[in-house]
Amino acid sequence: MQFDLTIPATTPTRHNRRNALRKLVAGVSFGLGLGFAMVPAAHATPAAPVNGAEYRTLDKAQSTDAGKKIEVTEFFWYSCPHCHAFDPALVNWVKKQGENISFKRVPVAFRESFQPQQRLYYALEAMGKLDDMQTKVFHAIHVERKSLDTEAAIADFVATQGIDRKKFVDVYNSFGVQSKLKRAAQLQEAYKIDGVPLVAIDGRYVTSPSIVGATLGSQPEAVLQTSTLQVMDWLMAKATKERKTASTGAPAASQIAAASKK
């Protein structure tokens, strides 16, 4: 199923831009869930998720740089209301994992117009301001209704947060940040991201509130978030077990099943 992510051409007023953005957000945020709506999942539950229902396995596992830890990656977009809503629950979940995981975020860009917010994220990261600013950026966009979609608007905003405007702009336009944008695009393609928020675990498994929602049906967003975290817990246990099996040299269940079919 294809989704039209093109913002309609309209008179360039703030009202029209916001209306167009809302339409785009709806398509981006729910793209994955709609894609899974026709998957049979009669026996799937968040506590016992099924591949192709509450989560999916990538055709090609991606390399991670987390060492012995399990890498957990959130793909997100600052202007996505579902990313904003999911963030507090995700942050709490990450804290509970302690040293078991290596957590990172990847800001996505489905269009060139998304790139200013990608640059915002990576500039804050480079300046060591991300932990303090992540929630503030979400709040500015979704609560204060600020349009942080241009370099000027973003620079003005960070300046109000006590960050040196000139230094920020220099980092925002730096080669280092540009390199991060290229890497983000590669990851977005590798993980086949067509909706956010989405969480990848150990470079192999992905899930999201919209994927889980395609199985559970119409539920309050808080229920979908909680269910997604349950699936993530299950995937963490699965990845941990598979790593232990691999380290001992014992064949994984998938390998045994594949061998039995030959």
Label every model-predicted segment:
Residues 2-115, 232-262:
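Extracytoplasmic thiol/disulfide redox context detector
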Residues 5-7, 13, 160-262:
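C-terminal cap of thioredoxin/glutaredoxin-like
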Residues 20, 153-154, 168:
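Hydrophobic/aromatic residues in well-formed alpha-helices
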Residues 68-69, 73, 79-87, 110-117, ...:
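Solvent-exposed, acidic/flexible segments
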Residues 70, 99-102, 127-132, 164-165, ...:
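Loop/turn elements at helix/coil->beta-strand transitions in domains of secreted/extracellular proteins
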Residues 76-79, 106-110, 122-123, 139-145, ...:
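Second-shell loop/turn segments in exported
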Residues 79, 90, 94-97, 124-128, ...:
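Sec/Tat-exported extracytoplasmic proteins
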Residues 96-126, 132-159:
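Structural microenvironment flanking redox-active thiols in thiol-disulfide oxidoreductases
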